UniProtKB/Swiss-Prot annotation:
It catalyses: a ubiquinone + NADH + 5 H(+)(in) = a ubiquinol + NAD(+) + 4 H(+)(out). Pfam families: NADHdh. Keywords: Electron transport, Membrane, Mitochondrion, Mitochondrion inner membrane, NAD, Respiratory chain, Translocase, Transmembrane, Transmembrane helix, Transport, Ubiquinone. It is a multi-pass membrane protein. One of its GO terms (cellular component) is mitochondrial inner membrane. This is NADH-ubiquinone oxidoreductase chain 1. The gene is ND1. Signal peptide: none annotated. GO terms for biological process: aerobic respiration. The keyword Transmembrane helix applies. One of its GO terms (molecular function) is NADH dehydrogenase (ubiquinone) activity. It comes from the Eukaryota. It is found in: Mitochondrion inner membrane. Its EC number is 7.1.1.2. It comes from Acanthamoeba castellanii (Amoeba).
Amino acid sequence: MVSLTVYFILLSLYLILNVILTVAFLTLFERKVLASIQKRKGPNWTGFLGILQPLADALKLILKENPVPQNASSVLFFGGPLILLILSLSAWFVIPFNNETVVSDINIGILYVFMVSSLNTLNIIVAGWSSNSRYAFLGALRSIAQVIAYEVVIGIIIINIIVLSGSLNFLKIVWAQKDLWYAFVLWAQFFLFFIAMLAETNRHPFDLAEAESELVSGYNVEHSSVLFALFFLSEYANIILLCHVATILFLGGWTMPDLYFFIKFFSVEYYVSIDEFFYTLRSNFYYITWIYHSLVYIIKVYIYLFAFIWVRATLPRYRYDQLMRLGWKVFVPLTIGLVFISISLTLFFDGFPSEGGYINHFFSSDIFI
């Protein structure tokens, strides 16, 4: 029992360290991609090809002064960013990186992540109010209204996933897509979810909570030094988290569709599934399947991250009224209609699946025999 507890503690610490390092080098990746799109070189002086630039930025922030505004609530001013980071990191404990690596495999994993993400909105309003700044408070109000609008969209889209997979467990949702990813079945929800992710994380072109020409830098305008770094870490941790969630919900996590490659040996033809091939090699090299699944999963996540950066480099910013109108008058009715269509089609074909997901249930039904 003690050894199991120590194992989970070490795994949790490893996960937190991994997230923080990923955030650090995601900033370098983002600056390099933006520089490439804009025909610049980007950071290339600090270390080989600028690889130490995140470390230099971290040291710069740590060594800066951390003034507290007059009449600010000191407890909330310092506690807001810290609680925001803790909530951002706590959502990671139910995210599976492959079939064997997950800190806590709970049956309501998707509901847990959605709940923890919703709690972040309370800390944003606390951070904006505690600094006693009009700009920070207006930025917090904007952020809250924006996040609530697009959390509704994300929640409705998640209902589609639950209907098709028959589960709220991340692992079961992944394996329900082993024959066909939900990105192909729910292609409209796939694109709507990506747009809602941009709005949920206050990313361009929906970064209206920190519009420089209107609100200086949003709800964290009075925070500097380590407190600003905590906001920065929590924001990018949420971006990476949503990319992981989207990969699991729509791109099948670490699974690949049953692509078959051809083997000809002594005039005998074999058709071997890629997943089955790696499971066969597992008897000789135990970690081969773990490595293969992890690489597939990481590549999918970085495709999402690249899309985030590409959107930032190419699209203009929306007006605030346009963003809210798009959320409440277009996305919410559209996603509700898509939910009813998904439920109707599911009931029309074979009813709700009890195990394995609707797609697997559909492909194994009599219609394909």
